[in-house]
Amino acid sequence: MNIYLIINHENQRIQNLIDKYHLKHDENSSMALIMNSNSLELYDRSKPRNKSIKVNFSSKKNNYRCLNFKKKNEILYKAIGIKKNYFPSVLDATAGLGQDSFLISFLGCYVIMMEYHPVIAALLTDGLERGYKDEKIGFWLKKRLHLIYDNSLNILNIPISQPDVIYLDPMYPINKKKSLPKKNMQFLRKLANKDDQSKNLLKVARKFAKKRVVVKRPSYANPISDEKVDFIISNKYHRFDIYLPFKKK
């Protein structure tokens, strides 16, 4: 994968990530990776006024969301199927920058993130490595949140345990009536493959999940497939379309 590389500081851990994901410098790439003293950040060179982004599981935003979590108001809790003494294993097949995966793991679930894009995988790995060492979250994060670098469409051929739940959060369709998506989403849209594999991924997920497949959608969007949604959990801003696994013949 070619991308513009900016080396602000020499850091062997960060360099190892660059090598691991075979990231090569491209002078003409509009997207850049910044190698800082202890983090890897993504930057859009075509929009120099925008700040760079990184995966930071110990950020103030994550801390706030966790500390102010209320079960009755958090539809993600219900969508995943978490109960008092039941914490399903979860495969996040569209990890992105790992925000929902982090919250699901905070709630007590064992979560595996899958990401096929080398730049995003490098950002996630950097975030995990720093998170594992964090004094506040490291002790539980290293037990519950992990990453597999592969295409989620291959899950039937990967030697991993069947998860109770497969979580899908495909790219939201652009709503022309609203302002541009948040910066993180704009960055991901620029990096990601434009081919929408959501329908195929849903079919594969329904073959592999034990209990349910959870698809996150904005309130204004249609389901990702013509397949029947078994039930829906929603609030004002977004909803979760829940699909049960295919019955084995």
Swiss-Prot record:
Domain of life assignment: Bacteria
The enzyme's E.C. designation: 2.1.1.242
TM region positions: none
Annotated S-adenosyl-L-methionine binding sites: D169
InterPro entries recorded: 16SrRNA_methylTrfase_J, SAM-dependent_MTases_sf
Signal peptide feature range: none
Location within or outside the cell: Cytoplasm
CC per GO annotation: cytoplasm
Gene3D superfamilies referenced in this protein's UniProt entry, alphabetically: Vaccinia Virus protein VP39 (3.40.50.150), YhiQ-like domain (3.40.1630.10)
An annotated Gene Ontology molecular function: rRNA (guanine-N2-)-methyltransferase activity
Catalytic activity: guanosine(1516) in 16S rRNA + S-adenosyl-L-methionine = N(2)-methylguanosine(1516) in 16S rRNA + S-adenosyl-L-homocysteine + H(+)
Membrane keyword on record: no
UniProt entry keywords in alphabetical sequence: Cytoplasm, Methyltransferase, rRNA processing, S-adenosyl-L-methionine, Transferase
Function statement: Specifically methylates the guanosine in position 1516 of 16S rRNA.
Similarity field: Belongs to the methyltransferase superfamily. RsmJ family.
Name of the featured protein: Ribosomal RNA small subunit methyltransferase J
